Amino acid sequence: MVITGNELWSKVQQALQHNLSKPTFETWIRPAICSGFRDGELTLIAPNSFASNWLRKNYVQTIEAAAAKIYGQSVRVSVQAQEEDSAERVLPPMTSASIPSPLPTAETTTASVAPSSGPRRILPGLNLRYVFNRFVVGPNSRMAHAAALAVAEAPGREFNPLFICGGVGLGKTHLMQAIGHYRLEINPEAKVAYVSTETFTNDLIQAIRKDGMQAFRDRYRATDLILVDDIQFIEGKEYTQEEFFHTFNALHEAGRQIVIASDRPPSQIPKLQERLISRFSMGLIADIQSPDLETRMAILQKKAEQERMMLPRDLIQYIAGRFTSNIRELEGALTRAVAFASITGLPMTVESVAPMLDPNGQGVDVTPQQVIDKVSEVFDVTPQDMRSSSRRRAVSHARQVGMYLMRQGTDLSLPRIGETFGGKDHTTVMYAIEQVEKRLSSDPQLASQVRRVRDLLQIDSRRRR
């Protein structure tokens, strides 16, 4: 049979699309491209080393079987990683195929999924909308999404624990709960627990008060998969950290999967025991960044299709351009716009919706990224320096000015500003603003630099309350 490598790979993809789940196909199979077919060997290129390793370990035999059936004789498959400088050519564009159909409207699961042999039934409390099919993958989240799916497919193997970090409203909880849904779909009898750190702490306190520590330990250590959200709130809680450390060890040694989410990496969580930092870092740390414009537009388009709404492209682009911080704000803006148009009877256009989203022109003047970029330019540091924990004098001063101008030029709260600068505490932001205000009156050079950044950003001199 005479066939080119691209033709063979295309036919293999078509065959596998019917045999694999949609998240699996979209994450691992669709992005790979064929780079050659010679002497019975099909060479594939994956977007990165992470994807190539996963394909080799989990799907090469499946691909070889499908290829052999199509080609009529055995086919060897080799997988390589795309070079970093050309990786963008491999990453697939966002298409309508990535947009899933709506799920049931119920918000959370209500039935127990733990087997009756367990010490107690564990209610996952998962939001039915938080599944892989409803997660829009962009450059900001591709690694975290792939890691989450890998863990869902093979828990307790490669990435244990999986530590997902990123700012507020970027999709950490969505990915965590998607892992839980995936496992329960494969095995409805799996013991899955999704808990916030606050819930874990409260359960621990109640166990201590009621002399129920053994029941507490049995409950958490009997899980097959534990999903722990907002682990940053464990900071400073010594006894909670102690108990979580032992729970972590018990689960990890038993080969149970642990998934943790935080707004910052383990090393940046204040007052976190070194041994927990070590445990949290021993698997894979997957970071989620703020989505770019194209991803934000894809998110809005997906939400509109799920709600069966037809929105003009310029309105989607307008909303995506105005709300850049996180996905919750983005979807919230769309919800407000739809409600406004429905109540007033006005058409869904930029002209009719813009005044509601930005009353009196007093909305967000600049984006956080613009502030960081311009301050970095004027103060001769890098944006990475601004978000780092570096205490070098030049970096520290630039970071303080960035926080000061972000408070003036955006509507972000102090905690949100802190998150933008690598997860700094809101008290750090307050201190930075106070220091800059004090120095402006006595440091002409600083005043000149601040004026220059303000001019570049066109920020007025008012102080937001």
UniProtKB/Swiss-Prot annotation:
UniProt-listed CDD domains: AAA (cd00009), Bac_DnaA_C (cd06571)
Designated gene of the protein: dnaA
Protein name: Chromosomal replication initiator protein DnaA
Residues spanning the signal sequence: none
Domain writeup: Domain I is involved in oligomerization and binding regulators, domain II is flexibile and of varying length in different bacteria, domain III forms the AAA+ region, while domain IV binds dsDNA.
SMART domains per UniProt: AAA, Bac_DnaA_C
Stretches for region Disordered: 86-116
Annotated organism of origin: Prochlorococcus marinus (strain MIT 9313)
Function: Plays an essential role in the initiation and regulation of chromosomal replication. ATP-DnaA binds to the origin of replication (oriC) to initiate formation of the DNA replication initiation complex once per cell cycle. Binds the DnaA box (a 9 base pair repeat at the origin) and separates the double-stranded (ds)DNA. Forms a right-handed helical filament on oriC DNA; dsDNA binds to the exterior of the filament while single-stranded (ss)DNA is stabiized in the filament's interior.
Biased composition annotated in UniProt, kind: Polar residues: 106-115
